[in-house]
Amino acid sequence: MYRSEHILKGLSNQYYRATYKSMGFTTEDLKRPIIGIANAWSECVPGHYNLRQVAQRVKDGIYRAGGTPIEFGVIGGCDGMGQGHDGMHFIMPSRELIANSIESMAQINLFDGLVLLGSCDKIVPGMLMAAARLDIPCIFLPGGPMEGGVEFDGRQAEQTSSTEAYGMLSAGKITEEEYVSLENTACPGCGSCSYLGTANTMCALAEALGMTLPDGGTAPATSAVRMMKAEETGVKIMELVEKNITARQIITDGAVRNAIKACLAMSGSTNAVMHLTAIAYEAELGIKVLNEFDTLSDTTPQLAKMNPACKYSIVDFYKDGGVPRLMENLQSMLETDVMTVTAHTLAENIRDHKYLYPATGLVNHTLDDPFGYTGGVAVLRGNLAPDTGITKPGAFDKSLHHFKGEAICFDSEEAAEEAILAGKVHDGHVVVIRYEEIGRAHV
């Protein structure tokens, strides 16, 4: 019996059917499995700007496979837009709001399955947290990464290039004309930021976790593959519903360990530590994510490298095989018997994957030829971080792995930015920003 039949089947449930029919749903529509589509589309976030089109293709797939899609909206704030002002204090709590609102809508409407559409920093983990709480068939699908912009300072430009350019302008290294020109060429189209920040890390890790279809985590926002993956997602959610493969059958201790290893191997965002911790918490798992990062970092090599660690973008990573290639190269270190949203195991996905592009070896390396012999994310302990701190050694030069300098402390992000722009931060300083904690999020 489908969950939705509790309110849509039988003479006594006419009220619910009449309510849906007021919006044009037919009797036949309401006899099918009801699939919720949680869509974080907005004009506030470039990573979500294409999600209207993505949602339509997901709906096409659901209809084709015998289901009825019902779409609802989800908030989604851009971390970049919140930086440098009080708005940043609202970013982390939004993750919990997203998880709570999706859980609420799914339970109010008794959806039989969920497709989760979002791309950016707090939206991806918030959606995966909701899936883990609900434990119904779910697939997460991002809108895909933005392609790189004009060549600037040795790599394809993106949003952070504008920040760097302001410093270069202040130092007299570029002209005002060059600076203004970059504003129009740094971001050539929609998508999540083209570097490996939190957004693309979490999209890639959703795929490594098994909650996104292969290549669904990193295919570009403007690509045909993105739309193909959307329709395939619509078809596949129906298979998960029919087979009753739920989120907690996929989000297991082994799957989370695989995602941790993928994060270490690609030198992903340090924020992945707290997000994977929260996802594991919502799935009621026993795994201690921070301890696993600490232990596995010593034995997991860095196999992928991209901006900000080098000039290659997340789209270059995708074209060099993306997450499927990374997981294939890591296969001997992974728990490959875990279930995924393909309704097959990770081992079967690796075995059957068809790559669209020939391997270049520029971004994805093998175990025999790693970028580094330890993970690209590390756990720190010491007097500055008695409860641990997280760093990303895979993204900066090895000469900085040991550094001694004078600490210059600020009590807010705004104060630090003001001092930097006023020329008060110099070579040899270690910038410390206090009191910007994440509050009561599950970490």
What are these regions (language model features)?
Residues 91-100:
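Glycine-rich, highly charged phosphate/nucleotide-binding loops
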